[in-house]
UniProtKB/Swiss-Prot annotation:
<keyword id="KW-0812">Transmembrane</keyword>
<keyword id="KW-1003">Cell membrane</keyword>
<feature type="transmembrane region" description="Helical">
    <location>
        <begin position="409"/>
        <end position="429"/>
    </location>
</feature>
<keyword id="KW-0472">Membrane</keyword>
<feature type="transmembrane region" description="Helical">
    <location>
        <begin position="305"/>
        <end position="325"/>
    </location>
</feature>
<feature type="transmembrane region" description="Helical">
    <location>
        <begin position="376"/>
        <end position="396"/>
    </location>
</feature>
<dbReference type="InterPro" id="IPR001750">
    <property type="entry name" value="ND/Mrp_TM"/>
</dbReference>
<feature type="transmembrane region" description="Helical">
    <location>
        <begin position="243"/>
        <end position="263"/>
    </location>
</feature>
<dbReference type="InterPro" id="IPR010096">
    <property type="entry name" value="NADH-Q_OxRdtase_suN/2"/>
</dbReference>
<feature type="transmembrane region" description="Helical">
    <location>
        <begin position="108"/>
        <end position="128"/>
    </location>
</feature>
<keyword id="KW-1133">Transmembrane helix</keyword>
<protein>
    <recommendedName>
        <fullName>NADH-quinone oxidoreductase subunit N</fullName>
        <ecNumber>7.1.1.-</ecNumber>
    </recommendedName>
</protein>
<keyword id="KW-0830">Ubiquinone</keyword>
<keyword id="KW-0813">Transport</keyword>
<feature type="transmembrane region" description="Helical">
    <location>
        <begin position="277"/>
        <end position="297"/>
    </location>
</feature>
<feature type="transmembrane region" description="Helical">
    <location>
        <begin position="209"/>
        <end position="229"/>
    </location>
</feature>
<feature type="transmembrane region" description="Helical">
    <location>
        <begin position="133"/>
        <end position="153"/>
    </location>
</feature>
Length: 488
């Protein structure tokens, strides 16, 4: 008796060039840092930034064009992967650019920080090209484990270690829920391949309680990673307790990676049973809009305020998924990318006003910023206006597009609800500007600090928010093309 074995197909490694490059360079950065003196830590930083620039270029070269699947169907190369990875690399570059002065001032400028960041970004890129449940989980855990370590990076800070422990425990529970959901999906469908899961879901998924239970657990696990209410409880403590640079990092690229997670699992894997998971996403979106905005109103710590406002922005991103259309998914991606840019600038201003022994964490620390630095006050105005959704900024287009996506599918009540809470959310953003422009600086307020490079980066960030608001077409077109939709 002869047993036939399937023919081995050599994987196309060229499709995974961004991940291979990131993996190799993360190891190179570690080795270079190992043999570098403290006075030459800048070399590690420059090498990290070079790695991300090349990774973004490789993502376009490797993925833009016809879709392809390799590594036995576990890895997909398509336009969506290209856009996601360019956004992840770009936001990672921006996050590291903001962190150098902060880390150097506090004696934390070590190669391990950049290595952890690169491995975290590698996990996000793996998620962006995942075509298999195990590949999704592999990328997600690589992201999560490195973020836990980054939160606790300042080991002498008790708040940071406490926040890292909370994040780790809650993250482990969420990972277990997600993995259990994936195992139920595998038990129902007999496959880990997302394309095969979609075929089964289309044929009899709506009547298979095992698949529906697995779907429910997967949504819960993904909602935690995204920071959607009521699975957002880790965010305020992590944002407040972690070094500000880590809070900046966690609020930017991982949100784009969460969009990748939603798209690959819910759209591609469980898309045929959209009617079953849509009500869950509606509940998550509504809860995020309500709790995120109302809780942010009561905050005096600006990092906690930004954490709760992140939950409200997640609610807006979820509106795009509720639509269940390619246009809706593309607007969610556009929102996540633009939110990452806005959030980086907001945390960047906190970093600018902070120095060794003083963290500008309270909203009152921004009193009289206009008197101390009119240029930085203007950047704060642009960022807060954009987060509010004032016309002329990119935040307005992001909100308008996701709201339009739910109107297009007949959920007008949800669109009105989102607009109402967007107006409520404007209060705490405008309150920050009240401190910046109308309050006098306290006598013991520290002077506006930061290197010329740091101030230049903030100016560029603010201008980007303004220019993307005036000329949003290129970014919108790229997000639409990622889902095969033409814009215009």
């Amino acid at each position: 008796m002869t047993v036939e074995t399937p023919d081995f197909v050599m994987p196309d490694f060229s499709l995974a060039l961004p991940e291979i490059w990131m993996l190799v360079m993360a190891c190179v950065v570690l080795v270079v840092d190992l043999y570098s003196q403290d006075s030459r830590r800048g070399m590690t930083f420059m090498l990290t930034q070079f790695t991300l620039v090349v990774a973004g270029v490789l993502a376009i070269v490797a993925h833009w064009g016809e879709p392809a699947v390799t590594f036995s169907g576990t890895y997909v190369s398509d336009n969506l992967a290209a856009v996601l990875k360019v956004a992840i690399a770009g936001l990672g570059f921006l996050s590291f650019a903001y962190c150098r002065d902060y880390l150097e001032d506090r004696g934390l400028l070590k190669g391990e920080y950049f290595v952890l960041g690169l491995f975290s970004l590698l996990g996000m890129m793996i998620m962006a090209s995942a075509h298999n449940l195990m590949t999704v989980y592999l990328g997600l855990e690589l992201l999560a484990l490195t973020l836990y370590a980054m939160v606790a990076f300042n080991r002498d800070n008790l708040r940071a270690t406490e926040a890292a422990m909370k994040y780790f425990v809650l993250g482990a529970i969420a990972s277990g829920i997600l993995l259990y959901g994936m195992s139920l999906i595998y038990g129902a469908t007999g496959s880990l391949n997302l394309a095969e899961v979609a075929v089964y879901a289309g044929e009899q998924g709506a009547n298979d309680w095992l698949l529906l239970l697995g779907m429910t657990l997967v949504v819960v696990g993904v909602a935690f990673k995204f920071g959607a209410v009521p699975f957002h409880t880790w965010m305020p403590d992590v944002y407040q307790g972690a070094p500000t640079t880590v809070a900046l990092f966690a609020s930017t690229a991982p949100k784009v990676a969460a969009v990748a997670l939603f798209v690959r699992l819910l759209s591609e894997g469980l898309g045929p049973i959209h009617d079953q998971w849509q009500p869950m996403i509606i509940l998550l979106a509504v809860a995020s809009l309500v709790v995120g905005n109302l809780a942010a109103l009561a905050q005096t710590n600006i990092k906690r305020m930004l954490a709760y406002s992140t939950a409200s922005h997640v609610g807006f991103i979820l509106l795009g998924f509720i639509a269940g259309t390619a246009e809706g998914y593309s607007t969610a991606l556009f929102y996540a990318i633009t939110y990452g840019i806005m959030s980086a600038g907001a945390f960047g201003l906190i970093i600018l006003l902070s120095h060794r022994g003083f963290e500008a964490e309270n909203i009152s620390d921004f009193k009289g910023l206009n008197d101390r630095s009119p240029a930085m006050a203007l950047m704060m105005l642009l960022l807060m206006f954009s987060m509010t959704g004032i016309p002329g900024t990119v935040g307005f287009y992001a909100k308008w597009l996701v709201i339009k996506s739910v109107v297009d599918v007949g959920l007008v009540w949800l669109a009105v609800f989102a607009v109402v809470f967007a107006v409520i959310g404007a209060f705490y953003y405008l309150r920050v500007l009240k401190f910046v422009y109308f309050d006098k600086p306290e006598t013991d307020a520290p002077p506006q600090t930061g290197s010329p490079a740091m101030r230049g980066l903030l100016v560029a960030n603010g201008i980007a928010v303004l220019l993307l608001g005036i000329f949003p077409d290129s970014l919108i077109s790229a997000c639409m093309a990622a889902f095969g939709v033409s814009y215009g």
